[in-house]
Amino acid sequence: MNRDLTKGSVTKSMLLFAIPMILGDLLQQCYNIADTLIVGQFLGRNALAAVGSSFTLMTFLTSIILGLCMGSGALFSIRFGQRDENGLCEDICASFYSIAAATVLLNVIAYLCLDALRVFLHVPDEVCGDMRAYLFVIFMGIPGIFLYNFFASFLRSVGNSVVPLVFLTVSAVLNIVLDLWFIIGLKRGVVGAAEATVIAQYLSGIGIAVYALLRCPQVRSIRRLRSLRWSRISEILSFSTLTCVQQSVMNLGILTVQGLVNSFGTVVMAAFAAAVKIDAFAYMPVQDFGNAFSTFIAQNYGARKTGRIRSGLKSAVCVSMAFCLVISALVFVFARPLMTIFVEAGEAEIIQAGVQYLRIEGAFYCGIGCLFLLYGLYRALEKPGMSVVLTVISLGTRVALAYLLSAIPAVGVVGIWWSVPIGWFLADMTGLLYFKIRKNKLLPLEKASIR
């Protein structure tokens, strides 16, 4: 199932590799959508607001693990492109133990800071009880999140995007079934929704880990390693930490904005909770295409095929922008029907606030599509620090403008919505300008471009 992205048609290679990743992350969204849909319809607005705020917090915590795994995955892809099997084995071993230790530490901190986090997010009193109960259970799934993301990153780095999809499919179906049983059948409320998600996360995490141990020689050969060079560990930690910072800063900004949203009351909280799910679902394919593009670039960077990388850049921009235009049109037109999937038709205020959010964000998906390509490009070219810079610009703008604009009575919550696309485009301009200036150093021309 491994796909060598250094050979064959550029566009076809990227698309065939990206499709399972896109399907897999759409199913990942089903974890969250199942909770939101069932909670919103059967447990009411307070429970929906609690789960929605918890989702934003969990996205931030998950982004720390995901960033570490993505950083390691980029190095795995480069080693694979270089055909450096021993180096790949060392990287896998160093990454696994480092990220596992970070995961344990993160889990402990999450529980110790549980009540402080609720205060930081300005959670209304009527939502506090449900949110605390939900988070207490959902934090138990963090090790499962690590297992899945680590081994999925490894498999994708060597061109296998199908197996992660298989395990996510099984766990997503289980999550939905357990949601219905625990919430409707067993009447376990928001705790039941959390339990369903945790069980599904462990199924996918343990399952993909067992698969990698049984089927991947690079993983099995870890047992033969007698020692690890500190230089290798240092490289892994440096690269992964920068990617982790990029991912966590991005979601810390979103978490900060969540606290501002919560200050506008339960109606806006519930609208934001539902609209963010739709928003994430809509642009998830371009995010995954950006990650697939990153693996393509990293493998070819390791193989020193810069001519192929340049061709891939042109193809990726065309594919991503075309998709963004289609999705923007669909979200803008169908914003109201999409909101009614998560919110009862009688909740007019919630629906209207959500529609307003979706139509503003949805009109500018080309901005986030370009930004995902830039993140993937700089990560693959061993410039993760540039991804951090772009994230700080995007999220710094978003947070600053959100607080400034929302404080103006005539603007209010709409200022929060508009701050998002403005941040995207400022980061895009910075990333494109940097690439234009440094292009020939980042991608020196080959004597004969290899296709």
Model features per residue range: what roles?
Residues 69, 137-156, 164-172, 193-208, ...:
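Short runs within selected transmembrane alpha-helices of multi-pass transporters and secretion channels
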Residues 45-56, 135, 194, 266-281, ...:
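Small-residue hotspots at the loop-to-helix junctions and early N-terminal turns
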Residues 30-49, 118-125, 181-188, 248-277, ...:
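Helix-terminus/linker motif at the lipid-water interface of multi-pass membrane proteins
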Residues 5-43, 56-71, 75, 100-107, ...:
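N-terminal transmembrane alpha-helices
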Residues 1-18, 76-143, 185-241, 297-364, ...:
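Short alpha-helical transmembrane segments in multi-pass integral membrane proteins
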Residues 60-63, 175-179, 205-209, 281-284, ...:
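Hydrophobic transmembrane alpha-helices of multi-pass small-molecule transporters
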Residues 48-108, 145-164, 271-335, 368-390:
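Small-residue-rich hydrophobic transmembrane alpha-helices
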Residues 16-35, 137, 148, 171, ...:
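Transmembrane helical elements of multi-pass membrane transporters/channels
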